[in-house]
């Protein structure tokens, strides 16, 4: 992977880790700065999960559509049920309270153990972390975990 891509992604991780007053003094991703992660340049079709790291950030081809990336990630999630794959398409911008959460440049697939992610989300649900999220975006991001955490957050989202 070229150094420019690596630096950009490291900067994005730094942005995800920043404490944000507009998010109740939470970071976009409160666990990002302490996670044991690696950044890997890989073809989308060649991704193979492993648990050597908390998170593996796969940088995949630039020339694929958002829908193709999301469909591939859905396939990975079905084929590797112990892992959670999350797509971040370079041209798709996502926000929480006006703060960009997506990297905005490269096509990425984040991979981590599903049970660890679910546990982290349960812990966050016991705080006011999710109070700042739009309900539709929250459901989109949490997917199956929405049902797991909604018991803690549903009253605030009404």
Which role does the model predict for each range below?
Residues 1-158:
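Expand to "…catalyze enediolate/carbanion chemistry for C-C bond making/breaking, isomerization
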């Amino acid at each position: 992977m070229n150094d420019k891509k690596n630096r950009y992604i490291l900067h994005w991780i730094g942005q995800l880790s920043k404490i944000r007053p507009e998010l109740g003094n939470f970071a976009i991703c409160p666990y990002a700065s302490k996670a044991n992660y690696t950044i890997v340049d890989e073809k989308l079709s060649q991704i193979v999960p492993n648990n050597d790291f908390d998170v593996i950030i796969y940088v995949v081809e630039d020339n694929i559509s958002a829908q193709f990336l999301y469909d591939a990630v859905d396939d990975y999630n079905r084929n590797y049920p112990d892992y959670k794959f999350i797509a971040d398409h370079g041209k798709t911008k996502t926000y929480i309270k006006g703060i960009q959460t997506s990297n905005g440049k490269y096509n990425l697939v984040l991979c981590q153990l599903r049970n660890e992610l679910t546990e982290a989300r349960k812990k966050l649900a016991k705080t006011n972390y999710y109070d700042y999220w739009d309900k539709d975006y929250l459901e989109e991001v949490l997917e199956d975990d929405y049902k797991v955490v909604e018991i803690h957050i549903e009253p605030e989202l009404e």
